[in-house]
Swiss-Prot record:
Function: Component of light signal transduction machinery. Involved in repression of photomorphogenesis in darkness. Plays a role in DNA repair by forming with DDB2 the UV-damaged DNA-binding protein complex (UV-DDB).
GO BP terms in the entry: DNA repair; embryo development ending in seed dormancy; protein ubiquitination; red, far-red light phototransduction
Name of this chain's protein: DNA damage-binding protein 1b
Keywords recorded for this protein, A-Z: DNA damage, DNA repair, DNA-binding, Nucleus, Phytochrome signaling pathway
Keyword Nucleus: yes
């Protein structure tokens, strides 16, 4: 790997941090807006459920997000503030379907200590001011003028230093806040203040409330006419206003999120730390509050946000489990729950650990993550590409084409599968035992190759061979009519739909036939100047049986042409350029947009948007799918149309948000595909590969596939052991007792079924910190080693831990030996046939010794002190890289002769590390708790020992995510014949559920892409006017520095989503053809 790195997202963040509901895209439309770490999603509530309208990245981590409606506006605006003290106000532009920035700014202060409890951003209900609490002791006010424009911000001193929550109150003549705070004796109180815009200070508010519940943590302002505020504690809920005080006791719980149900604010949904959802009701007579009632409704994921949509439908956003769309029913179900889950939205976060494995042994990595937390904990298997789940297969050599046919046009299922070979055609059908067996269609020719087949109107079938077109009854299977090719001419290529046939004979003759009831009529015959290479008349208009247009690919001038049917008038001719002929053309429609796809003989695919009224082609794009000729076929899955591109690297072409996407199919070399929806194998595909015909169902059409293994507890560490085909995890379970105690386990799982095979309970207060599969010198067994710590309530740092060594015997964990340690075993590594452990501040090497009685034990060989806490350790050969709690990366070396570990070099910057990895002998990768990644290099050329002992920082970049783990590996099949296959990659997993890839590029490719990134920065403007350069700059509490040694793959790959005009603008600036740019960026997308 190198110092020239490319960082890109393989899976976008999935943790929901904020959500809100309002009329954002139009005054009549109800929208749900969801924040996921660094992304904003806008959904529309439709009768079919939630419909995604937009999903955009934000150049910042979202700290607060609120909808509000300024005076005189018909729809809501969105206020967003980021953790790096930038804010923006966004508005939806209905005409262009884009976000526009109404206001933006920087609200950072030179002085001031950032708040411990996170940022607070609130908007006065009467839209007079925005309030921000970003630093201890300060409240920042941004006033609105009477036109809804923002005026200059100012700070007001806030006496309360330990602020827990601040909210604006309803129904106040001047903007008024309620502040929930903790004093220096740990008691909690609420105070109210009026904001005086004239004097720019606080005026004592209408009321205050002292000595609340010790767990009071959340304020909910109640709208007019009731007004006042709800104070949510762990054991009580209080309603408070200038003239009322009501309190009710509750079952001990920590409320994590709330959502208002009614506009008048008399009912609220509360979600707690255990995933229970309650309804809180304020009882009142007119405007007088008479009391509070609370009722348990049921269980959801542990909520981070709750948004009530409409008609008892609620969105529950979660950071610890899958987010959910739920319905609240009036009557409870059999289990007494009022909650019905309508939809789940996958969340991988927080990814605490993961491993990369090749379970299917296909040469393709899959990531198995420890995801979620507490009761929502799970394992997730993430893989790239689309899988085919095989249902049946037969050995067949030399397949040249395949088509499925029905026994009558109204049948729901296909009956026949026609398989064509060089000198014969075979017909397969399902027998009573649901097996494929050979049958006959008497009217078909079976001793010649079939060029095309299709179901036809009037319960007929059509077969095209090199010398005839045959029309056959699908019920009697007898020939009803035929058309013969003129003497001396043979049919080279043909296509058909239910009522039309188009074919080309040698010499450039194009013949168009129409199908009637027992009739085949030659309607038109034209002579073209060159030979025809491919044809298509797939209907994309209103009539599913008839096409108005024909697409024709040509030899010699290498063009694709569009003709109008029935009279074969040429309306469009598009020269493709280059020397490779089109091998397959297809007219298709995705999400209401018509396209022409054109596949070339070298594995490239061109796509155009097609104007069906005039045949014009526009927005030409070229991608490389494989290296051999591609055949295109449509199929449908989950009632959407997709296209299968069969070649040496098969892919599925589909559309999402009106954008064409390409996803690899996890099969090697597919020559032909056709849909085969039979009664025994519904929604299946028939796939011809080298020497076999497979029938199987296809996965959901998306780029990454995520399988969930719910375990109902929190997995913290995971490890795979190939020899025993198992995984071992260390996990904790929260016991639902009054004391909220935890139990920790090591569990063994089957690598295929993910069933629990065996469990080993850890001691009281003992938790698993690290896990490893390894073998030792002079011992052929493979072991699982587990490092633990005893976390005692009275200790700041653990003073005791264990290393447990297990062997898997008959699917069970057997403890072979254990070794007590003087601290937490944060990390374990296999090291030259020995075991390397990091224990608190020490690195310790153990060898595997045979005792006299034949048992084995770990014996200490040597160690190295000099760390604050050695949390993360990676090894390569004799080198040991250590990521310290706060002293960045140091490099140690093991000296065999002396049997000692010495420090070789270190990075002298103060970085609080969260993960470390070795890229090669000289380059080391690290990440810190300020969401940066960086690379340091061993200084081999240094003239003095002092210079050589100092590592040089060669790369710095703000990834904007909290990274928990790096692992070498890839999510895609490494294909030996592609340049991309040679690029080394590291995968990382984050708290927000984002999975990223860091790829090391050759320097000349890096330089080219850096130029492209600079051009893209000018053309693609950040949402809310936020700067890309500032966002990606390295940033911690001490310093900010421009990014170096890293490129933003997400920005570079967004080039492919640009309009043709913008692509050309960039192409001019770089002096590189658009096609070449597309090809180079396309290739990068194959890294993930």
């Amino acid at each position: 790997m190198s110092v020239w790195n490319y960082a890109v997202t393989a899976q976008k963040p999935t943790c929901v941090t904020h959500s809100c509901v309002g009329n954002f895209t139009s005054p009549q439309e109800l929208n749900l807006i969801v924040a996921k770490s660094t992304r904003i999603e806008i959904h529309l509530l439709s009768p079919q459920g939630l419909q995604t309208i937009l999903d955009v990245p934000l150049y910042g981590r979202i700290a607060t997000m609120e909808l509000f409606r300024p005076h005189g506006e018909a729809q809501d605006f969105l206020f967003v503030a980021t953790e790096r003290y930038k804010f923006c106000v966004l508005q939806w532009d209905y005409e262009s379907s884009e976000l526009i920035t109404r206001a933006m700014g920087d609200v950072s202060d030179r002085i001031g200590r950032p708040t411990d409890n996170g940022q607070i951003g609130i908007i006065d209900p009467d839209c007079r001011v925005i309030g921000l609490h970003l630093y201890d002791g300060l409240f920042k006010v941004i006033p609105f003028d009477n036109k809804g424009q923002l005026k200059e911000a100012f700070n007001i001193r806030l006496e309360e230093l330990q602020v827990l929550d601040i909210k604006f109150l309803y129904g106040c003549t001047k903007p008024t806040i309620a502040v929930l705070y903790q004093d220096n004796k740990d008691a909690r109180h609420v105070k109210t203040y009026e904001v005086s815009l004239k004097d720019k200070n606080f005026v004592e508010g209408p009321w205050s409330q002292n000595n609340l519940d010790n767990g009071a943590d959340l304020l909910i302002p109640v709208p007019s006419p009731l007004c006042g505020v709800l104070i949510i504690g762990e054991e009580t809920i209080v309603y408070c206003s200038a003239n009322a005080f009501k309190a009710i006791p509750i079952r001990p719980s920590i409320t994590k999120a709330y959502g208002r149900v009614d506009l008048d604010g008399s009912r609220y949904l509360l979600g707690d730390h255990a995933g229970l959802i309650h309804l809180l009701v304020i009882t009142h007579e007119k405007e007088k509050v008479t009391g509070l009632k609370i009722e348990l409704l049921g269980e959801t994921s542990i909520a981070s946000s709750i948004s009530y949509l409409d008609n008892a439908v609620v969105f529950v956003g979660s950071s610890y489990g899958d987010s959910q769309l739920i319905k609240l029913n009036l009557q409870p179900d059999a289990k007494g729950s009022y909650v019905e889950i309508l939809e789940k939205y996958v969340n991988l976060g927080p990814i605490v650990d993961f491993c990369v494995v090749d379970l299917e042994r296909q040469g393709q990595g899959q990531v198995v993550t420890c995801s979620g937390a507490y009761k929502d904990g799970s394992l997730r298997i993430v893989r790239n590409g689309i899988g085919i789940n095989e249902q049946a297969s037969v050995e067949l050599q030399g397949i040249k084409g395949m088509w499925s046919l029905k026994s009558s046009i109204d049948e729901a299922f296909d009956t026949f599968l026609v398989v064509s070979f060089i000198s014969e055609t075979r017909i397969l059908a399902m027998n009573i035992e649901d097996e494929l067996e050979e049958t006959e269609i008497e009217g078909f020719l079976s001793e010649v190759q079939t060029l095309f087949c299709h179901d036809a109107v009037y319960n007929q079938l059509v077969q095209v061979t090199s010398n005839s077109v045959r029309l056959v009854s699908s019920t009697t299977r007898e020939l009803r009519n035929k058309w013969d090719a003129p003497a001396g001419f043979s049919v080279n290529v043909a296509t058909a739909n239910a009522s039309q046939v188009l074919l080309a004979t040698g010499g450039g003759h194009l013949v168009y036939l129409e199908i009637g009831d027992g009739t085949l009529t030659e309607v038109k015959h034209v002579l073209l100047e060159y030979e025809v290479s491919c044809l298509d008349i797939n209907p994309i208009g209103d009539n599913p049986n008839y096409s108005q247009l024909a697409a024709v690919g040509m030899w010699t001038d290498i063009s694709v042409r569009i003709f109008v049917l029935p009279d074969l008038t040429l309306i469009t001719k598009e020269e493709l350029g280059g020397e490779i002929i089109p091998r397959s053309v297809l007219l298709c429609a995705f999400e209401g947009i018509s396209y022409l796809l054109c596949a070339l003989g070298d594995g490239h695919l061109l796509n155009f948007q097609l104007d069906t009224s005039c045949g014009k082609l526009r927005d030409r794009k070229k991608v490389s799918l494989g290296t051999r000729p591609i055949t295109l076929r449509t199929f449908s899955s989950k009632s959407a149309t997709h296209v299968f591109a069969a070649s040496d690297r098969p892919a599925v072409i589909y559309s999402n948000n009106k954008k064409l996407l390409y996803s690899n199919v996890n099969l090697k070399e597919v020559s032909h595909m056709c849909p085969f929806n039979s009664a025994a194998f519904p929604d299946s595909l028939a796939i011809a590969r080298e020497g076999e015909l497979t029938i199987g169902t296809i996965d959901d059409i998306q780029k990454l596939h995520i399988r969930t293994i719910p375990i109902g507890e929190h997995a913290r560490r995971i490890c795979h052991q190939e020899q025993t085909r198992t995984f071992a995890i260390s996990c904790l379970r929260n016991e639902p007792s009054a004391e909220e105690s935890e139990s920790h386990f090591v569990r063994l799982l089957d690598a295929q079924s993910f069933e629990f095979l065996s469990s080993y309970p850890l001691d009281a207060f003992e938790c698993g910190c690290s896990i490893l599969s390894c073998s030792f010198t002079d011992d052929k067994n493979v072991y699982y080693c587990v490092g633990t710590a005893y976390v005692l309530p009275e200790e700041n740092e653990p003073t005791k831990g264990r290393i447990l060594v297990f062997i898997v015997e008959e699917g069970r964990l057997q403890l072979i030996t254990e070794k007590e340690t003087k601290g937490a075993v944060y990390s374990l590594n296999a090291f030259n046939g020995k075991l390397l452990a990091s224990i608190n501040q020490k690195i310790q090497l153990y060898k595997w010794m045979l005792r006299d009685d034949g048992t084995r034990e770990l014996q200490s060989e040597c160690g190295h002190h000099g760390h604050i806490l050695a949390l993360y350790v990676q090894t390569r050969g004799d080198f040991i890289a250590v990521g310290d709690l706060m002293k960045s990366i140091s490099l140690l070396i093991y000296k065999h002769e002396e049997g000692a570990i010495e420090e070789r070099a270190r990075d002298y910057n103060a970085n609080w590390m969260t993960a470390v990895e070795i890229l090669n002998d000289d380059i080391y990768l690290g990440t810190d708790n300020c969401f940066n990644i960086f690379t340091v290099k061993k200084n081999n050329e240094g003239a003095t020992d002092e210079e050589r002992a100092r590592m040089e920082v060669v790369g710095e970049y703000h990834i904007g995510e909290f990274v928990n783990r790096f692992r070498h590996g890839s999510l895609v099949m490494k294909l030996p014949d592609s340049d991309i296959g040679q690029i080394p990659t590291v995968i990382f997993g984050t708290v927000s559920g984002m999975i990223g890839v860091i790829a090391s590029l050759p320097q000349e490719q890096y330089a080219f892409l850096e130029k492209l990134q600079t051009s893209l920065r000018k053309v693609i403007k950040g949402v809310g006017g936020l700067s890309h350069e500032q966002w990606r700059s390295f940033n911690n509490e001490k310093r900010t520095a421009e990014a170096k040694g890293y490129l933003d793959g997400d920005l570079i790959e967004s080039f492919l989503d640009l309009s043709r005009g913008k692509m050309e603008e960039i192409s001019k600036g770089m002096d590189v053809q658009v096609e070449e740019l597309c090809k180079r960026v396309e290739e990068l997308t194959r890294l993930h």
